[in-house]
A protein has these predicted regions:
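Contiguous surface segments at macromolecular interaction interfaces
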Residues: 1-5, 10-29, 47-50, 58-194
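Short coil-to-beta transition motif at edge beta-strands of beta-rich domains
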Residues: 31-40
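Compact alpha/beta protein-protein interaction domains typified by the UBC
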Residues: 42-45
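GIY-YIG nuclease signature motif recognition
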Residues: 53
Length: 194
């Protein structure tokens, strides 16, 4: 099956939970209605394309909330997402990083009409950019998630909440000693505990 190929923007401070395979879903106000291959762009101050995420078919949060009792954490978290306008949960299946992230300036040299979207854009409309991105050296896949069930302990959890977990702190300490650390220049939402 050929997946739709998109260019997906992220704020850098929200990236670490994805990198550490803690965040299982991306939440968006609007999104494609099919599985996608997303070239991942970290916005200012990074302004680089850092790799590829494989994303599953999104599901509507307003439909899934009905499966949970009103007194549960997952019900509360889903409603908080809905109140912020985040209608879709997009399963994050895998992440693969470029060995050398690509500045948006390089992309604009290849295609001067290219613009960074607020959410996403169809990369198939920018064939030269897509060809360039496809030819980059990559690390092995960081993780692979099979979404044959809903990860309820993770569903609609904020990145801020994820950063406070013991799992995040453990993986963050491991990553700080990893050679890839200097490649991914993203920060934190919370002040990092030592």
């Amino acid at each position: 099956m050929n997946k739709r190929i998109i260019f997906l923007s992220f704020r850098p401070k929200f990236f670490r939970p994805i990198l550490y395979d803690i965040k299982k879903y991306e939440y968006r106000k609007r999104f494609c209605d099919e599985p996608t291959t997303a070239y991942l762009y970290l916005s200012s101050p990074i302004r680089k394309v850092i790799g590829i995420m494989e994303l599953g078919k999104p599901f509507r949060m307003d439909e899934i909330v009905q499966n949970y009792d009103k007194d549960t954490d997952v019900y509360r978290r889903i409603n908080e997402c809905l109140n912020c306008g985040e209608k879709f949960a997009v399963p994050i299946e895998s992440l693969q990083l470029f060995k050398k992230p690509i500045s948006i300036n390089v992309i604009k040299e290849i295609e001067p009409k290219f613009f960074v979207p607020r959410c996403y854009l169809n990369l198939e409309n920018y064939r030269n950019v897509l060809s360039y991105l496809k030819n980059q050296d990559m690390y092995d896949i960081e993780f692979f998630n099979i979404h044959d069930k809903i990860y309820e302990d993770n569903l609609a959890m904020t990145c801020r909440e994820m950063e406070l977990t013991d799992e995040f702190l453990k993986k963050d300490n491991e990553y700080l000693n990893n050679s890839k650390y200097d490649i991914v220049e993203c920060g934190y939402i919370n002040v990092r505990r030592k």
